[in-house]
Amino acid sequence: GLLIAKEGGSIASKPHLASGITVGARMPSQMVAKHTSGVPVEFGNLIPSDGRYTIVIFAGNLSKPEQLSRVKHVSQVLELPEAFSQRLKQHAIDPQDVFQTLVLHTGSRDEVEITDLPSSLFLGSNPLGQVYVDNDQVRIWTLNEAYKGYGVDQERGCLVLVRPDRHVMYVGDLEDVDKLEKLVSSALV
């Protein structure tokens, strides 16, 4: 889908990165596991219609250092002074009131620690309830299907922006975080 930002620019989604997710449609749900406990949950239930946007970081295989580095780049862009989260803070608005971030990875829960992820990804929230895993380490009969269902590459991942009404607004590469940032900034701040 092509999105027109308020400032006149256009930002094109990359639907091929998540072939099971349709821009403009509701975010589908898949079974995943909570990273901290391994308890299975419906991913769609983590995206409530509560007035907040949700940034879903399909982080891919975080057991690989090069993939963790790609995810850290996302946080570096979100920490820039001109980033939407920083601009919200300048207006005395808590970013958590407007956004939530969810991370879904395919790495091993034994090899990946939540503390490996930059805290800035979580916009000041507690990351313990925001990191989920899709692999077959917990219950093989219910897991390791979310990335397939979403049509996302299990190694590389992608970014998805979900509107407050649970409809998908944007799909891009992790390296496209600057485009996501521009889209959000032009729409909100």
Which functions belong to the PLM regions below?
Residues 1-189:
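Helical substrate-recognition/capping region of FAD-dependent monooxygenase/halogenase enzymes
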